[in-house]
Design a protein with these regions (language model features):
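Glycine/proline-rich, positively charged
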Residues: 58, 104-120
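Residue-level signal for alpha-helical context at structural boundaries
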Residues: 96-97, 110
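N-terminal binding-site loop/beta-alpha segment at the start of enzyme catalytic domains
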Residues: 1-94, 100
Length: 120
């Protein structure tokens, strides 16, 4: 999809839009949570996940949710190419502060320090 057709498809998406708070940023009324594209629900087909992102954008979804804890950073890395290719149409929501340990998948700690926020 080239930039011209991407702009046209986003503009003709079927979702209503809303403004995020007082920011003035317009987003589709439905967002896409991307957590399952990196873990929690079994093996991920990255080509299928990318096709899902592209189709969601075509339908007017402009808000995509991720977090550094999803796949221990994999989710944000995976989304980076999609966001870069569609930057003018995409609003990215993220979260931070949850710490996991590689040797203990059930462990959840918290770090809301300014240093962790900047690093995440």
């Amino acid at each position: 999809m080239n930039d011209a057709s991407r702009s046209e498809s986003v503009q003709t998406g079927t979702l209503a839009t809303t403004t995020l708070g007082t920011s003035g940023i317009e987003v589709g009324t439905q967002g896409l949570g991307c957590m399952g594209m990196s873990e929690f629900y079994g093996a991920t087909d990255l080509a299928e996940a990318r096709a899902t992102l592209d189709r969601a954008l075509e339908l007017g979804v402009t808000l995509f949710d991720t977090a550094d804890v999803y796949g221990s950073g994999h989710n944000e890395e995976f989304l980076s190419d999609f966001v870069r290719a569609n930057r003018e149409h995409v609003v990215l929501a993220t979260k931070f502060g949850i710490i996991r340990k590689a040797d203990d998948p059930a462990y959840r700690g918290f770090d809301n320090s300014p240093e962790y926020i900047r690093a995440s």
